[in-house]
Amino acid sequence: MIGSGRKQFSEKLKNAKLDATLRIERIIWIGKFVQKIYQKHGITVEEVEDALLSNPLFRRIGRGHVKGEDLYFSYGRTNAGRYIFIVFVWKHEDAVLIISARDMTARERRYYNEHKKKI
C-alpha cells in the first residue's frame, strides 16, 4: 500500500523522545550525501556542522541496521540563523554519519523554538 511506510515513520517520529545529551566528537561525510544535500536543498557541509554543533535538539528515531548505531534527527540553527533539520546515524565513539539535511518546516521551527526554551 502506498504511503503506509510514511504513516509508520510518522508514528515513530511522534513517539520519539528528545535527547539533549549526545556528545559529537566527529562528523562522517560521504560524498554522495554531501552532493545530494547541496543540490537538493542548497545546504553546505559548513552549515550542517554549524547547526549540529551549536546546541541542537536530538530525537532518536529508531535502531540502525548495526547494533549500537541508531538513527537520529537533529533540529539545529546555524550562527547565521538558518534552521536546519538533519538526519544522521549515531556511530560508535561519539561519531555521526550525516544522511540528509534540509531547511526546517514552519512547524519544525515552532517545535524547535518551544523546546529550546525548556532546556
In which residue ranges do the predicted regions lie?
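Ribonuclease/tRNase effector modules and their secretory precursors
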Residues: 1-119
